[in-house]
Amino acid sequence: MRLPIFLDTDPGIDDAVAIAAAIFAPELDLQLMTTVAGNVSVEKTTRNALQLLHFWNAEIPLAQGAAVPLVRAPRDAASVHGESGMAGYDFVEHNRKPLGIPAFLAIRDALMRAPEPVTLVAIGPLTNIALLLSQCPECKPYIRRLVIMGGSAGRGNCTPNAEFNIAADPEAAACVFRSGIEIVMCGLDVTNQAILTPDYLATLPELNRTGKMLHALFSHYRSGSMQSGLRMHDLCAIALLVRPELFTLKPCFVAVETQGEFTSGTTVVDIDGCLGKPANVKVALDLDVKGFQQWVAEVLALAS
């Protein structure tokens, strides 16, 4: 039986690969997509998500979400993904539109209609998920678990200790991590290992139309290079759903720092139990890189 999932995303070049995997992995049933401001503005992430759905002729409803973080000014990662968020490929025009309700309400409504609890996957800032949990707490029993790409047990990528998705809205992340729902965190500890090699990247233009499109996007992606390999951060969250045996998980207490002058957005991961607090997150700490690369090749070969 296919696993029903809802995907909250901020496309983003590596988001595009994650969306492809969510659509084409035969083990998954992508039922709803929502967008959030993150890599670029929410207007751009929504446009990019709709372009991808049209490219793959995927009839999946999409709702536009939060334009700004809960309490602080927005930040973006245009330096990594380009000003549009998906520079490098000319998508054809379409007339698709997002749903007429905010993302968190679309998630609420879809959860309440679902015949069984649904897995949420969040690969951008956690603003929409925090709004859902704070404004619609009655939804919690309908969430099977939340798998996120975000955080780090060690070094960051936008400050010395903070990962971008968490640092973009620390208050939202703190709300989510305190919520009591089951959470799996795929942070930089594994995503920095999730590299597509130059040899594989060179094969993409001849793979299929998706490979050709992704290769064009990758030439504008600044998380690595075509010569040294590219990090597929967001794709790890999808891989964990399909191939959990590739990941080493450890239950830990995780809190999000929201006040520190130099540490705001840091995920404080208590690996050794120093704080004596019960674990609230399963943290991915290691990745079978070869197995991950093999799975990526398999799923992208299906994305025609």
Curated annotation (Swiss-Prot):
Q: Which Pfam families match?
A: IU_nuc_hydro
Task: Provide the E.C. number(s) assigned to this enzyme.
Answer: 3.2.-.-
SUPFAM superfamilies in alphabetical order: Nucleoside hydrolase
| Keyword annotations | Glycosidase, Hydrolase
Record carries keyword Zinc-finger = no
Kindly list the GO CC terms recorded for this protein: cytosol
Task: Note the superkingdom of the native organism.
Answer: Bacteria
Could you cite one Gene Ontology molecular function of this protein? purine nucleosidase activity
What InterPro entries does the annotation carry? Answer: I/U_nuclsd_hydro_CS, Inosine/uridine_hydrolase_dom, IUNH, Nucleosid_hydro_RihC_nonspecif, Ribo_hydro-like
Q: Name one GO biological process term.
A: pyrimidine nucleobase metabolic process
* Enzyme active site: 233
Family statement drawn from the similarity comment of this UniProt entry: Belongs to the IUNH family. RihC subfamily.
Q: What does this protein do?
A: Hydrolyzes both purine and pyrimidine ribonucleosides with a broad-substrate specificity.
Listed name of the protein: Non-specific ribonucleoside hydrolase RihC
- Species of the source: Shigella boydii serotype 18 (strain CDC 3083-94 / BS512)
Query: Lineage of this protein's species?
Result: Bacteria, Pseudomonadati, Pseudomonadota, Gammaproteobacteria, Enterobacterales
